[in-house]
């Protein structure tokens, strides 16, 4: 595949950031984490990024438009973000990847990363999934449960090396 960029999405704690980081290091490609950039963008505009329901629609749209333009102008770059695979649907040279894993794995990762109880992590993940689903459906009519066509789905419940290698082989 003649991919100029790799675009990775997935629900919280699905392993999308881990995959993006692994690929970036192995391929020596630039890495852009959309969520991290969005939080910076919000702060620069005087908005608390942790209060998702208070972020104006226009802030989301402006950021996503900038990200989409950047994707279109990039080469040898990995973009990771919740809806990045939808934002890149018109880019024929993008390898688009969806990270999928089961709820137990997501909760376990949250416990390890955040130091919270399993119950708190389950609640946090459920709330985040619901908020994200509502936000992106309202903004773009994106249903996170319905992937766009042409997306490679990887099971991220196994060690990252196995599915990172699968993606690298597709680039050859």
Indicate where each model-derived feature is located:
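Glycine-rich phosphate-binding P-loop
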Residues: 8-23
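Pre-Walker A (Motif I) flank of P-loop NTPase domains
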Residues: 2-6, 75
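Small-molecule kinase domains that catalyze NTP-dependent phosphoryl transfer to phosphate-bearing small molecules
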Residues: 62, 86, 118-166
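C-terminal alpha-helix
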Residues: 166-172
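ATP-dependent small-molecule kinase phosphotransfer cores
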Residues: 30-90, 103-104, 115-120, 130
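Conserved phosphate-donor/acceptor-positioning beta-strand/loop module used by diverse small-molecule
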Residues: 92-114, 124-126
């Amino acid at each position: 595949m003649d991919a100029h960029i790799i675009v990775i999405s997935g629900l919280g704690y699905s392993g999308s950031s881990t995959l993006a980081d692994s690929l970036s290091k192995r391929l020596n490609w630039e890495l852009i984490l959309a969520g991290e950039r969005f939080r910076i963008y919000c702060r620069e505009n005087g908005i608390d990024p942790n209060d998702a329901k208070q972020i104006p629609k226009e802030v989301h749209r402006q950021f996503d438009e900038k990200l989409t333009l950047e994707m279109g102008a990039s080469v040898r770059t990995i973009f990771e973000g919740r809806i990045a695979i939808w934002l890149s649907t018109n880019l024929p040279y993008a390898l688009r990847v969806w990270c999928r894993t089961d709820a137990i794995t997501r909760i376990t990762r949250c416990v390890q990363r955040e130091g919270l109880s399993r119950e708190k992590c389950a609640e946090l993940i459920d709330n985040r999934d619901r908020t994200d689903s509502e936000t992106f459906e309202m903004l773009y009519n994106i249903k996170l449960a319905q992937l766009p066509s042409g997306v490679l789905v990887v099971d991220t419940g196994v060690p990252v090396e196995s599915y990172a290698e699968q993606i690298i082989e597709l680039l050859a």
